[in-house]
Amino acid sequence: LTEINYPFNVKIKLVKPYDGAWMILHNENGHAALGAVEYMGNSILKTQDAYYKETGKRLEGMAQCLGNYITYYYPYGRGEMFNLFSVITDKPEESGVMCQWKKFELMSPLTKMVYSSDQSRFNYSNVKLIDGEASWGAVCLSDGVLFQSPAAMKLYKANIAADLGDNIRIKYASKAGFGAILYDEVGHRFCFYQNQSRSTTGDPNRFNPTNENPSSYRINPVPKRDNNVTDVDVNNLPVEQKVLWVGAGYEFDPNNSRGFYANSVSIKGLDSCFVYEFNMDGMVSTVDGHPAFAGYYKLKLPEGMDENSCFASTMSYSGILFYTVGNVVYRLDFKQSGGKATPVYTHAGGKATMMKFAKKAKINTNYLDFTNYEFDPNRSLGIVFDMGNGKCDFVV
């Protein structure tokens, strides 16, 4: 009314698109869609299909998996590490490394990520996992075959130690520190792959198998250490146990990238549960005197746990796993005498089908800035609930 302008002090924060967002690959109307949940101060921004919003195009294939991987990648810049984001559908020509701050530009298509001599072993329609948690490389599962990436999301078929034989099929895998914990369903045994540093380059178009996939780096049996737990042979598991999951767990030495535990859960019939604990420093080295197989916990089967349960663990919690039964999330304190299962969240109907912690890596660094997220990623658990009729809920 007075036509007098008054200055106000304001504070503006510029953020990259989808920086610190939860990305959710799902199917709708017969094709994949890339959903996003972003945190903007006290507000939450939900996008049903961020890929379509940014590109004006729909993904054509069906969803397979997402991947994130901290590595060198020259297309983004030299001398720094970046968090590569991969979107995988059953159409390889549209899958691969995407840049979320460049409108999901396809930087490296999946067809060019796999080393040419290994492409015959890579099943593009059955990619279950791309996991680069922690540091030192990533692993990928394609139709039971383990592929490894030393840098820049280049994928090589992992070599296999001779004493494991040729007939192995990796059902579960998880990066943890310098290595990856694996479960071979044919041999009914645990194995590990060592992703330690090697001569490589951040150029996604330059493959050098001699340096990047040397025969000295291979899938190995769990090593025998004098201080290993001896209650069970992890290289020859009891036939009555059924392994349900493996995952990276507590980081016992935050100053050591090898300082991760890895966990696995198996069940026997309807009465028993077993939690395995592996020390990844002991897996790859004898210098610090750690065991490779560090713990074996025999528990009464926790309430409701079965083959349909989802599992998750994180570097922040020692001796704790999370699992689901229907629409309920439980915390399992497996180091308590006999184990203790505590319900921590009950959803309004539906059934949990996927569960994962946001991040299992060091934060507050120049290449992992989660300040926009405003929460500790290592304590942020995302759960997908199937609500029926093609609908799902996502809860953090």
Positions of PLM-derived features:
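Beta-strand-enriched, solvent-exposed domains that form extended recognition/catalytic surfaces
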Residues: 1-18
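Low-complexity, Pro/Ser/Thr- and charge-rich linker/hinge segments at domain boundaries
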Residues: 13-30, 112-116
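Entry beta-strands of beta-propeller and related beta-repeat scaffolds
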Residues: 18-23, 83-85, 259-264, 317-321, ...
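Conserved, compact domain cores that house catalytic/ligand-binding motifs in diverse enzymes
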Residues: 22-93, 385-387, 391
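Short loop/turn segments immediately following the C-termini of beta-strands
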Residues: 27, 39, 88-92, 141-143, ...
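Hydrophobic core register within WD40 beta-propeller blades
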Residues: 34, 66, 309-314, 355, ...
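Preference for solvent-exposed, low-hydrophobicity sequence contexts
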Residues: 79-309, 338-342
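Blade-level signature of beta-propeller repeat domains, shared across WD40, Kelch, NHL, RCC1
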Residues: 353-396
